[in-house]
């Protein structure tokens, strides 16, 4: 069974950039719903497998992708944020960003543009392309998980579902994007980068 991970900080810790009300609803209601629905879907899937019911297995795929993706994405997202975040990464990750995007500012512009440009709900991502050995920006619709749908290893995810910002930023997604850079946990992103290079 999957369970809701604890946040590594208090709900109000990311103020004023992301307010406590958003964090509480986002974590304790939205993420919790993905976890519960994923567990329910997996139970139904096991039953369908046991019965050899391929039609039922196929019918469950969208729910598995949506709720499984929601759980994977949010579990990464919470650790990608920190009250002590912001600034720029250091060391090898910064060098890789400069190599693959020209500069940190250009990278920031591109990931912001990809995230703002998601139509409807979805995610902006910095991922690692293991085959080519470099960083890549991608956007995924809904809760589609980055690795499961593109093969890129997720390093940094930006949630652009309205539930991630609407209570504070209303319909002005670019303002939310501007604010979130102040709480990006570059240590966590760097750890993810170093792990996938091994």
Curated annotation (Swiss-Prot):
Q: What is this protein called?
A: Superoxide dismutase [Mn], mitochondrial
Q: Which UniProt keywords apply?
A: Acetylation, Manganese, Metal-binding, Mitochondrion, Nitration, Oxidoreductase, Ubl conjugation
What's the stated role of this polypeptide?
Destroys superoxide anion radicals which are normally produced within the cells and which are toxic to biological systems.
A Gene Ontology molecular function term of the record:
superoxide dismutase activity
Could you tell me which species this protein originates from?
Answer: Callithrix jacchus
Which residues are recorded with the post-translational modification N6-succinyllysine? 44, 51, 98, 106
Q: How is the cofactor bound?
A: Binds 1 Mn(2+) ion per subunit.
Write down the PANTHER family for this protein, in alphabetical order. Answer: SUPEROXIDE DISMUTASE 2 (PTHR11404), SUPEROXIDE DISMUTASE [MN], MITOCHONDRIAL (PTHR11404:SF6)
Chief place where the protein resides: mitochondrion
Q: How is it modified after translation?
A: Nitrated under oxidative stress. Nitration coupled with oxidation inhibits the catalytic activity. Acetylation at Lys-98 decreases enzymatic activity. Deacetylated by SIRT3 upon exposure to ionizing radiations or after long fasting.
Gene Ontology BP terms: cellular response to oxidative stress; regulation of transcription by RNA polymerase II
Similarity section = Belongs to the iron/manganese superoxide dismutase family.
Q: Encoded by which gene?
A: SOD2
Q: Which cofactor does it need?
A: Mn(2+)
């Amino acid at each position: 069974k999957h369970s809701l991970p604890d946040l590594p900080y208090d709900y109000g810790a990311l103020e004023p950039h992301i307010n406590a009300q958003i964090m509480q609803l986002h974590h304790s209601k939205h993420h919790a719903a993905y976890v519960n629905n994923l567990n329910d879907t997996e139970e139904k899937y096991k039953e369908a497998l046991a019965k050899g019911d391929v039609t039922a297995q196929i019918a469950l795929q969208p729910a598995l992708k949506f709720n499984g993706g929601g759980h994977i994405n949010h579990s990464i997202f919470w650790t990608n944020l920190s009250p002590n975040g912001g600034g720029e990464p250091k060391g090898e990750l910064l060098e890789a960003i400069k190599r693959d995007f020209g500069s940190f500012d250009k990278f920031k512009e591109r990931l912001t543009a990809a995230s703002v440009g998601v139509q409807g709900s979805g995610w902006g991502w910095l991922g690692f392309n293991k085959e080519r050995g470099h960083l890549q920006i991608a956007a995924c619709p809904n809760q589609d998980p980055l690795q499961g749908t593109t093969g890129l290893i997720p390093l940094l995810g930006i949630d652009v579902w309205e539930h991630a910002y609407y209570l504070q930023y209303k319909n002005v997604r670019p303002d939310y994007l501007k604010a979130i850079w102040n709480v990006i946990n570059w240590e966590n992103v760097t750890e993810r980068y170093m792990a996938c290079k091994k």
